[in-house]
């Protein structure tokens, strides 16, 4: 039975109201009236408010909250509104307002609406942050009045006032962008304390708690708002602990903490030449400014750059009444995931600290206990927490990351957001949630990011049992996978080493948001402090970066650039291996092995394959590459570069050099006859590996000088003189003639085959002989021959004539005729412009986007590094065009050539075979243009398969 209540033009409906006891029903109706009278509320979800207890629900025969609200009038616009309140069963926002309220603010509003215990607060919108930046980094007109009005609501709800010693209200001020950026922006806790307020708080809640909160606030406010290094406060704390002969800050007495507060206040004067601001309203204004400022901090900008986060207006600011986990042994704080973010296992995964505040867990300041300890010491709060987790998973239909505090045995929910997860975790969670009926396969495809698959394709240790004797310490397995590198102790060094091509293991006592660049550059991360939900762990998991945290056995000395494990000393530059799955720290350079595809991943990829339209092929030059590609789900070979086969042995490269030195076609044919068996053998292996799938083989493309060594030629010249009978002077002269001013636009591609038809003849003969041989062995062969660097239809016509002539001869000699295709690479802009002419000659087009990008931009791929970073930093380019397809320029050539080619030849097959074939946003563009396939490296095939599916769903 459905009951309804009409209030000021909005019809509120609850599917369960008639089932509730009468007194609960009356209470809810009163709440709903108050909700609908609240000004500018966009819409409200009528769900069980926080004040309806679970026992009342259970006594009515109901499960925890699932009531719904269907608004029948259009929602009130929130375009002009900049401050939104929430708490105690009501809110002015909802989870769909992330772009305006940030992820944290939207989810606080949502948790409030569904009846969870959320401390009242207000969210200042991201639009206000944008206005702040545009207003010269000062609060825009009228905003402080709106904040004050929101604060009045919080004070009324909490029956407390900011700055009132008799009824003290303390606040947290936190950032929250629309996209999660763990640790990148600022937080201030316990705001509102001064000497008078702390005395009042001490009278109500105890002196130790009050002064512990005060010293934390002085530290955090000083660092975040005043720019005082945290280390200056930490020095005072460590000095006092040493004087008292204690190890934990929890062992400090109230008198100790009171003394520490005075020392902290002196830090302000020593570091800034000014006193700590005691006016709570001024503290709040400064804190809001600091959070807005942190949006534009170097670490936040770097994080957004690394993760390609663009288009956001700014960060929201969440001002919330404080609840305290540091009020003794009946209080605590924790962070959890509703499923294991590393493995995906359906089990609560998190950490808990008794008598602590949330930043102690998240910042890795103290190494916390496993969440299971909470069940033992606070069973009622733990039971409610488990129920809340189930409610949130059902509501959001996703794995959630939750922060909570227990204050004197009462649970408070401080944050929920979609949890960051590893590749392994993402795939298992997606598959399990489909099996549980929470989501469908299309939603599952959207849930797994292409970066997640990239992580799954990273190597693991070849033989974990082989290194057991080299394990010197074990920390927490914070982010799975394996990492091998040389030890470094600063983020700056890690970035420098990475730029030099060195593999670094970043070793820190604990990481901070300032380390984000070095963390991204490092192969792996090792920290002495911090738990599974510390900054290092969360950021590393988000990137699929191997991380071992909370390794209490190590002592890090940044000044000496060493760390010690007992008597053992590990220096900068020493090789170290990390197992992020087990937490093992291993001396030396351990061997890595390629990863294997799990059953969950196979199931997930089958859903992606059913959804996508675009075929995914691979660039593979050897039988092993082809086998890897097939195992990774490739539907054929889109590019086999024949020149790579020439470097496989000394005999092959010698034969190539003889061919290059040849003066007459006859001499050249003798050398090519030596190469033919090698090429035929390689093609046979590739055809065998790709049985039943197309194999596109590109004829010789690079300039001939690339097959000659650089530097000292004397040894090679002498060798060639013996092999060819030419004099040294003749060989030097030949080499000199081969050198070009601009070789990438010189004597290469089809120009070689036209100038030396015998070169094309040899390669094509090897292809067709291998194809017939494999066919005779029962292998289904689908050969496709690709002519490179065509700029005119006449060039392609010439090479097709040579190819068809050789094919006819081989088929006649071997008594077998096969179907085959001949096509071309479109990599010269002119070819794209006259694609209708070239399309009449070709069976297929394959866009060589690497060269097409070079020639369209006029950038040399080998030299672009000299200015590319400047262009990216100044916004001249948004992306590296050799990584992400330039849709406005190069992309338009691809679109035009596809349309023109198909107009001339409706059966024309069209694909791409450049590096862009494995880049997700480029794959989306190629699908939109209507290409038939993309081809990428074997290890990126699963990524391209998923990207192609995500375009459709």
From Swiss-Prot:
Its main location: plastid. Activated by light-induced dephosphorylation. Inhibited by dark-induced phosphorylation. Both reactions are catalyzed by PDRP1. It holds the Pfam family PPDK_N. InterPro entries: ATP_grasp_subdomain_1, PEP-util_enz_mobile_dom, PEP_util_AS, PEP_util_C, PEP_util_CS, Phosphohistidine_dom_sf, PPDK_AMP/ATP-bd, Pyruvate_phosphate_dikinase. Homotetramer. The N-terminal domain contains the ATP/Pi binding site, the central domain the pyrophosphate/phosphate carrier histidine, and the C-terminal domain the pyruvate binding site. Belongs to the PEP-utilizing enzyme family. This is Pyruvate, phosphate dikinase, chloroplastic.
């Amino acid at each position: 039975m459905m009951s309804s209540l009409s209030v000021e033009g909005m019809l509120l409906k609850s599917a369960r109201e008639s089932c509730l006891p009468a007194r609960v029903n009356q209470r809810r109706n009163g709440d709903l009236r108050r909700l609908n009278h609240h000004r500018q509320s966009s819409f409200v979800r009528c769900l069980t408010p926080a004040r309806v207890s679970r026992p009342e629900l259970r006594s009515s025969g109901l499960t925890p909250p699932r009531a719904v609200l269907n608004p029948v009038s259009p929602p009130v616009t929130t375009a002009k509104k900049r401050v939104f309140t929430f708490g105690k069963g009501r809110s002015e926002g909802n989870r769909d307002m992330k772009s305006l309220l940030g992820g944290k603010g939207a989810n606080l509003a949502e948790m409030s609406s569904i009846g969870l215990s959320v401390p009242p607060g207000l969210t200042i919108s991201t639009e206000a942050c944008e206005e702040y930046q545009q207003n010269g980094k000062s609060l825009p007109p009228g905003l402080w009045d709106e904040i004050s009005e929101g604060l009045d609501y919080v004070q009324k709800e909490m029956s407390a006032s900011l700055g009132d010693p008799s009824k003290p209200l303390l606040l947290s001020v936190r950032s929250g962008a629309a996209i999660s950026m763990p640790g990148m922006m600022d937080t201030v806790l316990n705001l509102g304390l001064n000497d008078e307020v702390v005395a009042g708080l001490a009278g109500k809640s105890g002196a130790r708690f009050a002064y512990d909160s005060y010293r934390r606030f002085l530290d955090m406010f000083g660092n975040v708002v005043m720019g005082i290094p945290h280390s200056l406060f930490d020095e005072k704390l460590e000095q006092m602990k040493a004087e008292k002969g204690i190890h934990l800050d929890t062992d400090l007495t109230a008198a100790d903490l009171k003394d520490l507060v005075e020392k902290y206040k002196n830090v302000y004067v020593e570091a800034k030449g000014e006193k700590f601001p005691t006016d709570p309203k001024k503290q709040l204004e400064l804190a809001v400014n600091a959070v807005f400022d942190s949006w534009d901090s170097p670490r936040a900008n770097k994080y957004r750059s690394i993760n390609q986060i663009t288009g956001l207006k700014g960060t929201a600011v969440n001002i919330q009444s404080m609840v305290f986990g540091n009020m003794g042994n009946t209080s605590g704080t924790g962070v959890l995931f509703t499923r294991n973010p590393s493995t995906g296992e359906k089990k609560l995964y998190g950490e808990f600290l008794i008598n602590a505040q949330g930043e102690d867990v998240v910042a890795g300041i103290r190494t916390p206990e496993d969440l299971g300890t909470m069940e033992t010491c606070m069973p009622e709060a733990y039971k409610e927490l488990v129920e809340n987790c189930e409610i949130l998973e059902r509501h959001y239909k996703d794995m959630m990351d939750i922060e909570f505090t227990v204050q004197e045995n009462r649970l408070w929910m401080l944050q929920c957001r979609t949890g960051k997860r590893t590749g392994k975790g993402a795939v298992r969670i997606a598959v399990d949630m489909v099996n549980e009926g929470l989501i469908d396969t299309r939603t599952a495809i959207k849930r797994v990011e292409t970066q997640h698959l990239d992580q799954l394709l990273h190597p693991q240790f070849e033989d974990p049992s082989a290194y057991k004797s080299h394990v010197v310490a074990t920390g927490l397995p914070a982010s799975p996978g394996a990492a091998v590198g040389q030890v470094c102790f600063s983020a700056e060094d890690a970035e420098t080493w990475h730029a030099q091509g060195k593999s670094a293991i970043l070793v820190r006592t604990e990481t901070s948001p300032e380390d984000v660049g070095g963390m991204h550059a490092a192969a792996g991360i090792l920290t002495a402090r911090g738990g599974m939900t510390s900054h290092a762990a969360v950021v590393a998991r988000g990137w699929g970066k191997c991380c071992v945290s909370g390794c209490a056995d190590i002592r890090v000395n940044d000044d000496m650039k060493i760390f010690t494990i007992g008597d053992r000393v590990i220096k900068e530059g020493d090789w170290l291996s990390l197992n992020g799955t087990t937490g093992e720290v291993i001396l030396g350079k351990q061997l890595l092995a390629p990863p294997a595809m799990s059953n969950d991943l196979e199931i997930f990829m089958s859903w992606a394959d059913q959804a996508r339209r675009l075929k995914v092929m691979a660039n593979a030059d050897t039988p092993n590459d082809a086998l890897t590609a097939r195992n990774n789900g490739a539907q054929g070979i889109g590019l086999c570069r024949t020149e790579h086969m020439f470097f496989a042995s000394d005999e092959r490269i010698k034969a190539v050099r003889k061919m290059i030195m040849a003066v007459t076609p006859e001499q050249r044919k003798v050398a090519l006859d030596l190469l033919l068996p090698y090429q035929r053998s390689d093609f046979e292996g590739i055809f065998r590996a790709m049985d039943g799938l197309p194999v596109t083989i590109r004829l010789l493309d690079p300039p001939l000088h690339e097959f000659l060594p650089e530097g000292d030629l004397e040894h090679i010249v002498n060798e060639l003189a013996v092999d060819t009978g030419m004099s040294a002077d003749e060989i030097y002269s030949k080499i000199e003639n081969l050198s070009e001013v601009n070789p990438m636009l010189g004597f290469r591609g089809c120009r070689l085959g036209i100038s030396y038809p015998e070169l094309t003849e040899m390669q094509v003969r090897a292809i067709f002989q291998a194809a017939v041989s494999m066919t005779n062995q029962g292998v289904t062969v689908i050969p496709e021959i690709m002519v490179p660097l065509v700029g005119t239809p006449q060039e392609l016509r010439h090479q097709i004539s040579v190819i068809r002539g050789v094919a006819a001869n081989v088929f006649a000699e071997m008594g077998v005729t096969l179907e085959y295709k001949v096509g071309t690479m479109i990599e010269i802009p002119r070819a794209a412009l006259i694609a209708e002419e070239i399309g009449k000659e070709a069976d297929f087009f394959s866009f060589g986007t690497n060269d097409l990008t070079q020639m369209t931009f006029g950038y040399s791929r080998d030299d672009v590094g000299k200015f590319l970073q400047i262009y990216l930093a100044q916004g001249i380019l948004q992306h590296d065009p050799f990584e992400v397809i330039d849709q406005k320029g190069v992309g338009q050539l691809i679109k035009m050539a596809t349309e023109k080619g198909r107009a001339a030849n409706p059966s024309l097959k069209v694909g791409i075979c450049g590096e862009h074939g494995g880049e997700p946003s480029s794959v989306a563009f190629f699908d939109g243009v209507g290409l038939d396939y993309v081809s990428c490296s074997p290890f990126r095939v699963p990524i391209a398969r998923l990207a192609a599916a995500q375009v459709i769903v």
